[in-house]
């Protein structure tokens, strides 16, 4: 398939997919909150899109202005509600360590995503800010106007966050995998999630996100052999974007 695919060709492929032995069961598109409108939503729905990833980055308007993001938190809330009303799964991209942030304010910001019912996405991806050359942030770094956290500060903050996430959310990614030689400042650990999980286990902490509770990850990462005797049904009821959500899981 190419970007030049016509509507007729797309419809044909969608019909073929319905009877294929190995079917595509989901389609994800990434965009910005301020690009979400009825026309865009109808086009994405026609393409068969099931999930939208939103570049939220932060829920503090002062920081969004400082980094010249081009949208505010009102746009985030509006887009989130609109997408949910049209039946899409919503995945937020969150970026701790942005200019103007501290580990404490980042923790507060990310917890607000679940404390405030106008947010509450289905999934999140956490991308700690890193600095590469030929960027405005690199110029800030050289002038001493921006400084990243230490690895220890970042790990400690993310441990506190993971220990408090609700059961209905999936943390589907914890870093953006950028080659280390390109990174001028910021996290370079490609296994950051594993480092955090190992420390949490030693400290008796647990992440209840959907990914961490999946049987496959329990078996391969936590070496759990059998969960049959521990299986329980959970129904999480919560308010989100003016509606009531029920998340059912085991």
Task: Label every PLM stretch briefly.
Residues 93, 124, 171, 227-229:
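Intrinsically disordered low-complexity regions specifically enriched for long asparagine
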Residues 145-220, 229-250:
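C-terminal accessory regions of radical SAM enzymes
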Residues 33, 37, 180, 220-222:
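Low-complexity, compositionally biased segments
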Residues 1-89, 95-152, 156:
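Conserved non-cysteine loop/helix-boundary elements of the Radical SAM core domain that shape
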Residues 2-5, 219-228:
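Intrinsic disorder/low-complexity segments
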């Amino acid at each position: 398939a190419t970007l030049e695919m016509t509507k007729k060709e797309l419809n044909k492929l969608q019909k073929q997919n319905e009877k294929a032995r190995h079917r595509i069961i989901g389609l994800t598109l990434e965009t910005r909150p301020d690009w979400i409108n009825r026309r865009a939503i109808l086009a994405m729905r026609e393409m068969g899109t099931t999930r939208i990833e939103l570049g939220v980055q932060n829920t503090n308007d002062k920081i969004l202005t400082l980094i010249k993001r081009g949208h505010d938190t009102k746009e985030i809330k509006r887009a989130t509600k609109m997408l949910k009303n049209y039946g899409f799964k919503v995945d937020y991209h969150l970026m701790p360590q942005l200019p103007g942030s501290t580990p404490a304010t980042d923790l507060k910001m990310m917890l607000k995503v679940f404390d405030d019912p106008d947010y509450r996405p289905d999934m999140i991806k956490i991308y700690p800010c890193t600095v590469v050359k030929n960027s405005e942030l690199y110029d800030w770094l050289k002038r001493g106007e921006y400084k990243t956290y230490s690895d220890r500060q970042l790990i400690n903050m993310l441990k506190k966050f993971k220990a408090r996430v609700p059961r209905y959310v999936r943390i589907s990614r914890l870093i953006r995998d950028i080659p280390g030689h390109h990174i001028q400042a910021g996290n370079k650990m490609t296994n950051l999630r594993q480092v955090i999980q190992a420390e949490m286990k030693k400290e008796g902490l647990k992440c209840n996100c959907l990914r961490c509770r999946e049987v496959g990850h329990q078996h391969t990462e936590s070496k759990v052999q059998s969960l049959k005797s521990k299986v329980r049904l959970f129904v999480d009821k919560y308010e989100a974007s003016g509606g009531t959500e029920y998340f059912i899981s085991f």
